[in-house]
């Protein structure tokens, strides 16, 4: 007997590297290349540190209200967490407490099975088709819950509002969690379905389209009943997860719709241009509705490509994992950054062909 | 069958009220009456919001390093969490995973049993003596872990380093978690015992003595092995719990030792003066080593006293709970605030005596 016998053993999630090179092109964690709204800068400048002696609002009251108004929902339908990873984590803990396995695509955000192992939630992976498309029919079976990223990561591919509605219609006895971390880059949000389904929970984040990965804010939207349960679990986990400054920064980021739309549009335009250039170079590229592309080249091994890009100080993401080990995920940066990537790949492919 | 059947049912912790009255004297959540170090203000002023587009360090690397240096420990002995509530929560999940009940005092931080219920950890409450003192012998029995707040809350009373060492000596096969949230106000930290015991975990916070309740930073110190396990669980729960600004603010608060010592001393002096005045008024007051006092008046019902204080806009804390329902916990504010409380109580007692 030793204290080590009482440990909860887990295999943790490994986040994308945050390297300390200064002259790199960092395209590995889907960060936004543009700064957050200038309203955020203003809030920070105006913040008085003496306020920090007091505890923040336990449930980020004003931020929830701002988000509810923005999305035409009630405040009690909005949950704020410490990044969407925490929102997902607490959602798994709250909603997936049944005996039956929860369902998720076999290729998706790799944190989902890790939450399941942390909380000992049985789960079943449903294979995507060979082209990474999702068939809703495979979710018409008994389950203890469903989690689907829409658009999906790392494929970038989206399913339609109608498909989500079909899943909901066939699964009214378990929570259907739709992770919309990347929804603002071209997918269709299922928030309107909250009117019809009290078992739908939609998770979004400030980290991607709002350029606020550094401040850790995530959201869950759902029925007042579901959100109340999520708050009960949150209040059994941590009283005050969102600091005062983060609450104010979150509010500020929703006051400048013009800037938001402009920076999102820019990323979408860059993505489409980048994608076309990649196709010209012989890459296979999925139909991404996100701020990244998922790519494969029939003539280059992805592990090798990851390495040569890294040596050229271009950092992308690669998984040594069945079905996707031949693929790379590349975040959309600025036009300039993506041009550098294209120029590098052109050169690399030219030299490679010469060497045949 | 319905989605509600899959819910994880809990009775959440209820934090002290954060009322929105502006002219109140808020002595209910043990906040520091003094502002944080001016270095904190400077860090906020200098912060560039464009940095927020990037994810923060997953493990608050520089802040851990600063804390390790301050306490003469190694960086791998330091864990940073989103407030000490999160640190405690993740510690319970990580370390208390055995079959045997964990032990805790019957009167202590009311979050402990709530974590146990959240994670389904069996626990046993060990009664304090009638004078709220803790007998170490009652912790010499089989257990799956031990958690003790030192100084204790809400009693404010501390145990000695030697007593903690005795507990550790008799419990080398389970984690002994010492919650030192209030340690800087007069208790003796058990950090030096980390040299001898790899099963000791010490939790501290930035919320009390560092005046940073609003920024949500908590710490666990332990053996490199214990801390690595805690990080594994944290990395299965949430990748990036501490935002970039909070990491910098935490670092800044440790650069101004003079200010820190001065504000802590001031609170201790105010506490002792306040305590003496209360005793003169007939109150029974425990020997507090914290920034609050725990008080009882033989002639006044605590529920009534709580109410009349509230009506006078003086907000303190009361629990409707066995053994302490006759007691109030009063945070130490400024001298001026505590004088107002004393004046009010003098007046109230005088009028009460008249009415006999």
Curated annotation (Swiss-Prot), chains A, B:
Source organism of this protein record: Lactococcus lactis subsp. cremoris (strain SK11)
Protein family: Belongs to the class-II pyridoxal-phosphate-dependent aminotransferase family. Histidinol-phosphate aminotransferase subfamily.
Enzyme Commission numbers on file: 2.6.1.9
Cofactors (names): pyridoxal 5'-phosphate
Record pathway: Amino-acid biosynthesis; L-histidine biosynthesis; L-histidine from 5-phospho-alpha-D-ribose 1-diphosphate: step 7/9
Stated name of the protein: Histidinol-phosphate aminotransferase
One MF annotation (Gene Ontology) recorded for this entry: histidinol-phosphate transaminase activity
One annotated GO biological process: L-histidine biosynthetic process
Reactions accelerated catalytically: L-histidinol phosphate + 2-oxoglutarate = 3-(imidazol-4-yl)-2-oxopropyl phosphate + L-glutamate
Record Pfam families: Aminotran_1_2
Transferase as UniProt keyword: yes
Residues found modified as N6-(pyridoxal phosphate)lysine: 208
InterPro entries assigned: Aminotrans_II_pyridoxalP_BS, Aminotransferase_I/II_large, HisP_aminotrans, HistidinolP_aminotransfase, PyrdxlP-dep_Trfase, PyrdxlP-dep_Trfase_major, PyrdxlP-dep_Trfase_small
Keywords assigned by UniProt, alphabetized: Amino-acid biosynthesis, Aminotransferase, Histidine biosynthesis, Pyridoxal phosphate, Transferase
């Amino acid at each position: 007997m030793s204290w080590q016998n009482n440990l909860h053993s887990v295999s943790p999630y490994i986040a994308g590297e945050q390297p300390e090179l200064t002259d790199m092109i960092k395209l590995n964690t889907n960060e936004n290349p543009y700064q957050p709204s200038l309203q955020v800068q203003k809030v920070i400048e105006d913040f008085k540190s003496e306020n920090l002696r007091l505890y923040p609002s336990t449930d980020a009251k004003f931020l929830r209200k701002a988000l509810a108004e923005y999305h035409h929902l009630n405040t009690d339908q909005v949950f704020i967490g410490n990044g969407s990873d925490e929102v997902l984590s607490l959602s798994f803990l709250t909603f997936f407490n049944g005996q039956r396995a929860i369902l998720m695509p076999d290729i998706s955000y790799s944190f989902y099975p890790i939450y399941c192992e942390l909380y000992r939630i049985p789960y079943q992976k449903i294979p995507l088709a060979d082209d990474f498309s999702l068939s809703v029919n495979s979710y018409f079976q008994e389950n203890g819950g469903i989690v689907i990223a829409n658009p999906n990561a790392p494929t970038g591919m989206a399913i339609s509002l109608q498909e989500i509605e079909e899943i909901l219609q066939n699964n009214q006895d378990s929570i259907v969690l739709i992770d919309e971390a990347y929804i603002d880059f071209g997918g269709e949000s299922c928030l309107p379905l909250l009117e019809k389904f009290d078992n739908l929970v939609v998770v979004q984040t400030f980290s991607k389209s709002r350029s606020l990965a550094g401040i850790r804010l995530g959201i869950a939207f759902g029925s007042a009943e579901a959100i109340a349960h999520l708050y009960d679990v949150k209040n059994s986990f941590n009283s005050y997860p969102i600091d005062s400054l983060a609450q104010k920064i979150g509010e500020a980021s929703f006051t400048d719709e013009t800037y938001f739309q402009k920076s999102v549009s820019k990323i979408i335009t860059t993505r489409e241009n980048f994608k076309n250039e990649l196709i010209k170079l012989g890459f296979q590229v999925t139909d991404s509705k996100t701020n990244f592309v998922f790519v494969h080249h029939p003539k280059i091994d992805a592990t090798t490509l990851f390495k040569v890009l890294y040596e050229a100080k271009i950092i992308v993401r690669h998984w040594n994992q069945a079905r996707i080990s031949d693929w790379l995920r590349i975040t959309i940066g600025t036009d300039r950054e993506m041009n550098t990537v294209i120029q590098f790949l052109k050169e690399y492919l030219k030299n490679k062909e010469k060497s045949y």
